[in-house]
Amino acid sequence: MKTVTEFQNKNILVLGIAKSGYAAATLLQKLGANVIVNDGKPLAENVLAAELQAKGMDVVCGGHPLELLERNISLVVKNPGIPYSNPILVAAKEKQIPIVTEVELAYRISEAPFVGITGSNGKTTTTMLTFEMLKEGQKHPVIAGNIGTVACEVAQDAKENEVVVTELSSFQLMGVELFQPKIAAFLNLFEAHLDYHGTKKEYGLAKANIFKNQTENDYSVINADDADVMALSAYSKGQKVLFSTTKEIEDGACIKDNALYFKAEKVVEVDDIVLPGQHNLENILAAMSIAKLLGVSNEAITAVLKRFTGVKHRLEYVTTINNRKFYNDSKATNMLATEKALSAFTQPTVLLAGGLDRGNEFDDLIPYFKNVKAIVTFGQTAPKLVRAAEKAGLDTIESVDTLDEAVVKAYAHSTDGDVILLSPACASWDQFKTFEERGDIFIQAVHKLI
């Protein structure tokens, strides 16, 4: 960890605890700050807040009183999930108090360079692929952020010869000031999180913060097939490395003659890749570009792609029952992810979908229903998905209350050779704490059929 003195004796407000807030508060106390911790949950129900209080921190729970800003606050470190419309953040902005997220702290203390990966879909798969390729290539990667350990915990132990690989959301990237990844990858962009950002434009600009501090000594890995990403890459001063699944790119990564190429050099045959889905070729090209820029050999990249079958809850194969294959794609929290999941299969498919209603309709899914023989909907969006399925002309459409019921119904509507796919196209928070919980419940329900 770098020697950092900028926080000593400063009053710093950590807003929202959870994992990242707890880690940030603990780090800041170690760095000599006077830490004030604030969380909306009452102290009596807040185990992490009680632990921080026991460490000697000033803890205020049960709301976000504006009076906290009268304590000569030098910096606010916010939980990514707390919107900037929260009155205490609005007031902090008016007072010109800097507002950052925990990843900014991680960057400031880290001896190791960062690789940052963002996009609407594919972040986790690309991050894991990058980590595995760098590990196989003996580049000493450590993984942080939304996957695994909180970034500022990882950064404390990261050494100069290591690489911190981190998946970054738009929420995290809105709160960066100095964060400067050696390599920044922007995978794709489509309309999402409008309840937080308001418009697609603002969402895209938040993502583009990944380029904010890059210089000509850094690299920006860009999806050349995404017009929005290409436009936002104008914010990067780094060396641009493009990737594409649709056209040849001499100075970047592409697919040619059934092989993946980087800067006109063949790296791996497509037939050697075991990860399913056309969309995953985009993720692979991005990860391969990062790995090649950091000096990983073609042999190491190929070795990873011959064994990497995917990430849990992302088009995860579960089991086969009576020649029906079950797949868990609970991470599909938006339509684009479900479109890509449906495109991965040519077999007749029974789709399970539904979840939190964020105000959108589902007509964009209709062209992807060509192999869908039945749909079972659940959650808040069930009526909207039923409408889309009816417009698509599906014969078998069911709505149920729970995911357990959906699995039973889906199996009943399937026949020999079918795929049964959970790909909700919605966030999970109407019925589940996380998409991981939703996926685990799906897997448990599937195994009950055996």
From Swiss-Prot:
GO molecular function: ATP binding; UDP-N-acetylmuramoylalanine-D-glutamate ligase activity
Catalytic function, reaction form: UDP-N-acetyl-alpha-D-muramoyl-L-alanine + D-glutamate + ATP = UDP-N-acetyl-alpha-D-muramoyl-L-alanyl-D-glutamate + ADP + phosphate + H(+)
Group of enzyme by EC: ligase
Region forming the signal peptide: none
Sections of the chain in a coiled coil: none
Keyword annotations from UniProtKB, A to Z: ATP-binding, Cell cycle, Cell division, Cell shape, Cell wall biogenesis/degradation, Cytoplasm, Ligase, Nucleotide-binding, Peptidoglycan synthesis
Pfam families noted in UniProt: Mur_ligase_C (PF02875), Mur_ligase_M (PF08245), MurD-like_N (PF21799)
UniProt keyword Cell wall biogenesis/degradation, yes or no: yes
EC number(s) on file: 6.3.2.9
SUPFAM superfamilies: MurCD N-terminal domain, MurD-like peptide ligases, catalytic domain, MurD-like peptide ligases, peptide-binding domain
NCBIfam families: murD
Protein name: UDP-N-acetylmuramoylalanine--D-glutamate ligase
